[in-house]
């Protein structure tokens, strides 16, 4: 009650924030005549002056009115588009590191130019993050005209660029790209061997377009760079054959709500007989059990044309939120291979993680982060808790005129689809354009078939027909046009109403099913009613829809029976709509917990990742690695000598053991013969340093490259192994809950112990390698490439194989081709030697 009164008297927090910005908007408007008097050639000069002022210490906030006024005038001259006052407010919210919630058609792309130009003045780069390559290229080319007019450079990061092109794009004042490309470039940079090979130059300021899609919808899927593991793919086919013989409810049960499939006791016994083992849960059969469960999930929880499609002999994931294909992405943990076996296509080898990061932790690296979307308010709590981002609702330039009708709920899907087809036919006959939103490819193709039978012309936009996405969406507002689109395909493209459509009521949105997230439903509705245009929306539901079936449809079903509903007759009741909304809230809460749990676990990995990546950067950029090597040596010797330094004289066995470790780790017998007495720690230290000094003398200027090569090689090998061990720990840690232990705390504790052990193994490994080197030939070029450590050879033992490389789409290099490293020599005499 008090909160309500406070809000009534003082306005909401959002209102108060916008009110504070009004004087700044007035100041920008007051500068308009001054900016109008500038010649075109004066604009880059002004920007150069502002850059100089920033270098001299002037704050961006103080320059905001002038810069915003300059950008507004540039927009008028380049695009004949003047930023509205509400767009200036949106630009300020972004500059302040907030999420600007702006309705569809309010010009988010143009709004972003204001804070982008202001923050580009620092010279540290601004990243504009979009959901797909098409939007990145479109916005970079479109808004690039304005930036170039102002004398600022623009780069764009899309799939398929080489490192040189990426480095040039990141070197620009403003860089457009997708969240995946930015994240993967960060991971790839931390697998490079030389500082000059790095493409990114830090994380200063990012504006994330469709921020809800990127920071929430995609946050459940971490970015992973992986290399092929050694496991055979034959087991997947065998397990697939077994699962096909199982009967639901007899051999296994499925919980669709929790998305789990479990074998019954009868099923376990049946599988043991088919596989030919005594105990499926014996530790020796853990691989068989794992593959069997993945095959069970593939057959019962993942549906073709809903969760994935089969295209050109490959299983391609369908994004559950946008309905777009995600080529190159694969389900982890053997699930993708299980789907390949199910669909009888070629099974690719299972991958091993080489580097990974979640979007949450990647975007939290930016010094300042901001976002734009049409729908963020329902997720405001999550944005605040995880990213410390505040959502600001920006007023529309013109009042919203869209009418949102109550949901029409039917008993069965058949009744619902019949009603939808009839409604579309009636609207089409009247000439009113319709955008039909579906959750799956399956539904969109079913409706398309029904409309063909009734003779209603229409366009279909889903993951199978996405080539003309922007063109199809742009035409969706034309008179009599019917467009069927999965989810939010086509976001980012405005639907402009055709001639005479306003008089017919504008664009009608027809939702065929409620999504588990209210925000996705709101996004669909938001395609209509842009810039004060008329419009309408209605969702058609049935008790057989997944959301209704899994979350409380019994109450609604009982209510419909009491009301005496006839077949084909819908119910429109606020009570039912509220029940559906509550179901959505429960699902949203569940998904938030999943994302939060993922973040809790990744935070443990994130701290470790930061340590490893800092070590790598230091190794790449340090002019002299001598002090680091001496520090490593002191740590190694402290551990080696620990058994012999307990106070009492060490036994003969202890002395022998210490000598053995000195020989193994430091190759000390190269300069010192074992004796009944141990050398002092200082003597051992001097002996090892003498070996390194000899190496320095023999290799000259290449010494630093040799040290760096082996340090990075060992670091990468141990980190890759550690990631695999952490994956295994994570897989089994949930069982600790049965022993009254907190799985997260256990993961943190054990993960830290494993990390400490790994750091020590790195130090040991570096000395084990370096003290065994003998010089054969020294060519500096040999150390410029991780693949060719040809300048040195081991005097004892064998070199371990380098880490598996991530799958790349690069063409294979022939033995007689020029080497891609740029040396000018043939591949067979250079990196292919």
UniProtKB/Swiss-Prot annotation:
Listed EC numbers: 7.4.2.8
Which residues are Zn(2+)-binding?
819, 821, 830-831
- Where is the major localization of this protein? membrane
Q: Which Gene3D superfamilies match?
A: Helical scaffold and wing domains of SecA (1.10.3060.10), P-loop containing nucleotide triphosphate hydrolases (3.40.50.300), SecA, preprotein cross-linking domain (3.90.1440.10)
InterPro entries per UniProt:
Helicase_ATP-bd, Helicase_C-like, P-loop_NTPase, SEC_C_motif, SecA, SecA_CS, SecA_DEAD, SecA_motor_DEAD
The residues the record assigns to binding ATP are 87, 105-109, 494
Q: Which GO terms describe its molecular function?
A: ATP binding; metal ion binding; protein-exporting ATPase activity
SUPFAM superfamilies tied to this protein: Helical scaffold and wing domains of SecA, P-loop containing nucleoside triphosphate hydrolases, Pre-protein crosslinking domain of SecA
Q: What class of enzyme is it?
A: translocase
- Which cofactor names does the annotation list? Zn(2+)
Where is the region Disordered? 789-816
Which residues lie in Basic and acidic residues bias regions?
A: 806-815
Q: Cofactor binding mode, per the note?
A: May bind 1 zinc ion per subunit.
Biological process (GO) annotations held by this record are: intracellular protein transmembrane transport; protein import; protein targeting; protein transport by the Sec complex
GO-annotated cellular components: cell envelope Sec protein transport complex; cytosol; plasma membrane
Lipid bilayer topology: Peripheral membrane protein
| Quaternary structure and interacting proteins, as annotated | Monomer and homodimer. Part of the essential Sec protein translocation apparatus which comprises SecA, SecYEG and auxiliary proteins SecDF-YajC and YidC.
Q: Which family does it belong to?
A: Belongs to the SecA family.
Q: Which NCBIfam families is this protein grouped with?
A: PRK09200.1, PRK12904.1, secA
Function, as annotated: Part of the Sec protein translocase complex. Interacts with the SecYEG preprotein conducting channel. Has a central role in coupling the hydrolysis of ATP to the transfer of proteins into and across the cell membrane, serving as an ATP-driven molecular motor driving the stepwise translocation of polypeptide chains across the membrane.
Q: What is this protein called?
A: Protein translocase subunit SecA
Whose protein is this, by species?
Answer: Nitratidesulfovibrio vulgaris (strain DP4) (Desulfovibrio vulgaris)
Taxonomic classification: Bacteria, Pseudomonadati, Thermodesulfobacteriota, Desulfovibrionia, Desulfovibrionales
